[in-house]
């Protein structure tokens, strides 16, 4: 069983800053995961050609209807005009959710294994702004800092049927505000403990490796690898955390892909 997390950076490439759908398809096929959590996902955004990125990833993976979902963190365009997702809105995309209702931004979860149930966990934005590092416009340039207000976040979890029983897999993209991302992580981990065990959390936690491990007592880091920036990774922001009785990890990889400023993290389980 092969699980992966990938911050898709709205489908953009660092090479030229362009969004080319074929590149995202190439990246997803290279990852070749049985279960994939994706972050910074656009739906119906002009900046990424108006595509439903989660649906495009589902096609690239060969995931059937009912086994993928997009969960919006916000409606509108991040960094521009947006509104919070209404309480109780539920998954905003996926074959069972009806037509898209305008631009949205969030996370997606896709599984080649049968999905038994879906759960979403909203995570409130920080009350303060914070500096955030963004990639340089030049491929080998140094990252630059921008002062940005925070935005709502969300986690999406699926209970999967595997050969050895139920497995819950979740994905999220936490706040860049120091400390607030720890608050969000602890709230999320508490919610995930209430779901069928074992659990694997896939995501961009915006926390360096050692901080994430300290903030998640009782959870095992299944991959200790640098993931950012993609061209020359020095920091681990993208994590795979496990809770409960999981198979042994056989291999971990961080392939360099034609899209994103992050490396994907791919974990291969035994069996």
Predicted regions and their residues:
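Active-site beta-strand/loop signature of hydrolases that rely on acidic residues for catalysis
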Residues: 3-8, 24-50, 110, 158, ...
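Short, P/G- and charge-enriched loop/turn segments at secondary-structure junctions
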Residues: 84-100, 142-147, 225-229, 252-256
């Amino acid at each position: 069983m092969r699980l992966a997390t990938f911050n898709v950076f709205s489908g953009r490439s660092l090479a030229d800053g362009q969004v080319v759908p074929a590149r995202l398809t190439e990246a997803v096929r290279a990852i070749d995961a049985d279960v994939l959590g994706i972050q910074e996902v656009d739906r119906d955004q002009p900046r990424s050609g108006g595509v439903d990125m989660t649906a495009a990833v589902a096609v690239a993976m060969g995931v059937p209807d009912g086994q993928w979902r997009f969960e919006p963190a916000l409606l509108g365009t991040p960094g521009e005009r947006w509104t919070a997702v209404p309480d109780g809105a539920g998954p905003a995309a996926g074959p069972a959710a009806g037509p898209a209702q305008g631009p949205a931004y969030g996370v997606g979860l896709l599984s080649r294994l049968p999905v038994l149930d879906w759960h979403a966990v909203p995570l409130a934005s920080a009350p303060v702004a914070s500096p955030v590092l963004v990639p340089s416009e030049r491929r080998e340039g140094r990252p630059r800092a921008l002062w940005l207000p925070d935005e709502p976040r969300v986690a999406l979890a699926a209970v999967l049927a595997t050969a050895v029983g139920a497995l819950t897999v979740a994905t999220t993209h936490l706040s860049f505000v120091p400390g607030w991302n720890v608050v969000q992580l602890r709230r999320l981990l508490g919610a995930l403990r209430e779901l069928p065990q074992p659990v694997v959390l896939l995501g961009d936690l915006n926390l360096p490796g050692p901080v994430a491990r300290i903030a998640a007592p009782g959870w095992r880091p299944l991959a200790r690898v640098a993931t950012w920036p993609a061209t020359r990774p020095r920091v681990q922001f993208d994590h795979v955390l496990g809770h409960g009785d999981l198979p042994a990890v056989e291999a971990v990889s961080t392939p360099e892909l034609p899209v994103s400023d992050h490396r994907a993290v791919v974990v291969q389980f035994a069996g």
